[in-house]
Amino acid sequence: MERYEVIKDIGSGNFGVAKLVRDVRTKELFAVKFIERGQKIDENVQREIMNHRSLRHPNIVRFKEVVLTPTHLAIVMEYAAGGELFERICSAGRFSEDEARFFFQQLISGVSYCHSMQICHRDLKLENTLLDGSIAPRLKICDFGYSKSSLLHSQPKSTVGTPAYIAPEVLARKEYDGKVADVWSCGVTLYVMLVGAYPFEDPDEPRNFRKTITRILSVQYMVPDYVRVSMECRHLLSRIFVANPEQRITIPEIKNHPWFLKNLPIEMTDEYQMSVQMNDINTPSQGLEEIMAIIQEARKPGDGSKFSGQIPGLGSMELDDVDTDDIDVEDSGDFVCAL
């Protein structure tokens, strides 16, 4: 890590801590996720690194490299100076339909690319969507800890993700198509941007996890009367929030939906993005063998020293062992800041 100087903490989570660093030579800023060596370097960490490394798209936080310190595995990635999309909604209360569409178009563009690379995210949520520092912010998907590649891993079965964003078929604990489940999570994100609340949580009992699950399974949601949403947008939501995954709208169909296509920036079109990707010859700085060797070494315990700090965006959990009849689990986070 001699190549980087730490500027400040930018948060902490279940994984460890995140810090803002500067490349001593180039003066470039990066975010670094520090994960304690030893038991915490599990298959999720390896999956996150391997999947993230393969993705190169303007709406995905770019992976740079992994570095081993005496105490931690450090994942170096692009720094998104604009913070979380979640924080922006908290400040605004909710977005206008045009602003929501602007960010949704970028979200779908990034997710579509992930799926084209045979990777489903499985934990799409506002806290995992960051913004760069520009005036018209570019959305950046991050956190691939729960992602699965159909090229490297089996079809998803485990119930992972954040309760408010989980698709009905994921709750059923059977094998499901992670790409189709991602569509549902994108719909939840769109709804939250428009309304400033989660679609399937009871506003009077936002922490009643059992009720949230019941509402998800029965697709029980509504757009409040005080929120002005066009019929085209309502139609798109109704096509996303479909319990049967085989009948749910797909990402390619979303990209052809009239509401999505309105005011679509040229850089969001498939043709433009294809040309950008063909011209992106900037290959990852590390080979697979080097990365795997670093991960293997990181599984050996370090000297045990710890960092401190706070990071937003908690709330993901493994739900395989949860009994939905006897649930005492916190929800994904109340919208105390909105409305």
Swiss-Prot record:
Keywords: Abscisic acid signaling pathway, ATP-binding, Cytoplasm, Kinase, Nucleotide-binding, Nucleus, Phosphoprotein, Serine/threonine-protein kinase, Stress response, Transferase. The active site is at D123 (proton acceptor). It catalyses: L-seryl-[protein] + ATP = O-phospho-L-seryl-[protein] + ADP + H(+); L-threonyl-[protein] + ATP = O-phospho-L-threonyl-[protein] + ADP + H(+). Phosphorylated. Pfam families: Pkinase. InterPro entries: Kinase-like_dom_sf, Prot_kinase_dom, Protein_kinase_ATP_BS, Ser/Thr_kinase_AS. Its EC number is 2.7.11.1. One of its GO terms (molecular function) is protein serine kinase activity. Residues 4-260 form the Protein kinase domain. Activated by phosphorylation in response to hyperosmotic stress within 5 minutes. Expressed in leaf blades, leaf sheaths and roots. Expressed in shoots and roots of young seedlings. Residues 253-339 are annotated as: C-terminal. Transmembrane segments: none annotated. ATP binds at I10, G11, S12, G13, N14, F15, G16, V17, A18, K33. GO terms for cellular component: cytoplasm; nucleus. Induction: By hyperosmotic stress in leaf blades and leaf sheaths, but not in roots. Induced by abscisic acid (ABA). Interacts with BZIP46. Interacts with ABI5 and PP2C30. Interacts with PP2C51. May play a role in signal transduction of hyperosmotic response. Can phosphorylate BZIP46 in vitro. Together with ABI5, PP2C30 and PYL5, is part of an abscisic acid (ABA) signaling unit that modulates seed germination and early seedling growth. The C-terminal region is necessary for the kinase activation in response to hyperosmotic stress. Belongs to the protein kinase superfamily. Ser/Thr protein kinase family. This is Serine/threonine-protein kinase SAPK2. It comes from Oryza sativa subsp. japonica.
